[in-house]
């Protein structure tokens, strides 16, 4: 369990489909005042996995994702200081989410490594 990831594969927002039944419930659970670096797609994925127990990844392409230097994700280059900082905030969001929703959890290896690296940045 020490190595288990608590977050699912998160596709870009344009690739997420949500049933109408869950849409209002999801928006009720989204809180953007806390953890501002955590994007909506990540939050929807976590809510879908842990609250609704429904998270499916289809092996089909319905949209195409294009990366450019102008989009917001370009501020989070892999293993950069910003990337590690946002990853730490994602772990903090997960801990807050689990505690707020009474979901049993344990901190994993990634949590500890991310926090150690952030101490040196």
Regions found by a protein language model. Give the residues of each.
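Non-catalytic, C-terminal membrane-associated alpha-helical segments of glycosyltransferases
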Residues: 77-85, 107-121
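Prokaryotic Sec-type signal peptides and long signal-anchor helices
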Residues: 46, 101-102, 113
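Generic structural signal for hydrophobic core residues of well-folded globular domains
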Residues: 51-52, 98, 120
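Noncatalytic linker/hinge segments flanking ATPase motor cores
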Residues: 14, 56-59, 96-108
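Catalytic core of nucleotide-sugar-dependent glycosyltransferases
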Residues: 63-69, 75-104
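Conserved nucleotide-sugar donor-binding catalytic segment
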Residues: 1-78
